[in-house]
């Protein structure tokens, strides 16, 4: 299993809305994430800094990257553009983090 972590931002006035939209996420999106090998996906909110910290375990980089080209992911990204900064393709602005410590 490959562990990934990344940081995104949420608009200061959208903390509650961001959380509402994720509880629960669309069943179709959940199915796509699982079918593409995502496990133990979690997102944490740092309210003071409007930061989102996400962790996910994936089976392969190729399958994980393929999620972005699915119709449901494209619709989800568009749905989220009013609550968080987005790139021109509507994907969330994010930075992948480097793992520096792991205790199994």
Swiss-Prot record:
Cleavable signal peptide: none
Organism annotation: Escherichia coli O7:K1 (strain IAI39 / ExPEC)
Gene Ontology biological process terms, A to Z: rhamnose catabolic process
InterPro entries listed in its UniProt record: Dimeric_a/b-barrel, L-rhamnose_mutarotase, Rham/fucose_mutarotase
Keyword Cytoplasm applies: yes
Pathway(s) of this molecule: Carbohydrate metabolism; L-rhamnose metabolism
Function: Involved in the anomeric conversion of L-rhamnose.
Gene Ontology, cellular component aspect: cytoplasm
Catalytic activity, as annotated: alpha-L-rhamnose = beta-L-rhamnose
Name of the molecule in the record: L-rhamnose mutarotase
UniProt record similarity statement: Belongs to the rhamnose mutarotase family.
UniProt cross-references to HAMAP family, sorted A to Z: L_rham_rotase
Protein EC: 5.1.3.32
Sorted UniProt keywords: Carbohydrate metabolism, Cytoplasm, Isomerase, Rhamnose metabolism
Superkingdom in the source lineage: Bacteria
Localization, UniProt: Cytoplasm
Active-site annotation: 22
Oligomeric and partner information: Homodimer.
Encoding gene (name): rhaM
GO MF annotations in UniProt: L-rhamnose mutarotase activity
Main location, first listed in the record: cytoplasm
Annotated binding of substrate, by residue: 18, 41, 76-77
Any Pfam family: rhaM
């Amino acid at each position: 299993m490959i562990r990934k972590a990344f940081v995104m931002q949420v608009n200061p006035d959208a903390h509650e809305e961001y959380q509402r939209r994720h509880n629960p996420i669309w069943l179709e999106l959940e199915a796509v994430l699982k079918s593409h090998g995502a496990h133990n996906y979690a997102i944490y909110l740092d309210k003071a800094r409007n930061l989102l910290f996400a962790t996910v375990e994936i089976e392969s980089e190729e399958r994980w990257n393929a999620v972005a080209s699915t119709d449901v992911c494209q619709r989800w990204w568009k749905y989220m553009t009013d609550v968080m900064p987005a790139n021109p393709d509507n994907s969330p602005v994010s930075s992948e983090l480097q793992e520096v410590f792991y205790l199994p």
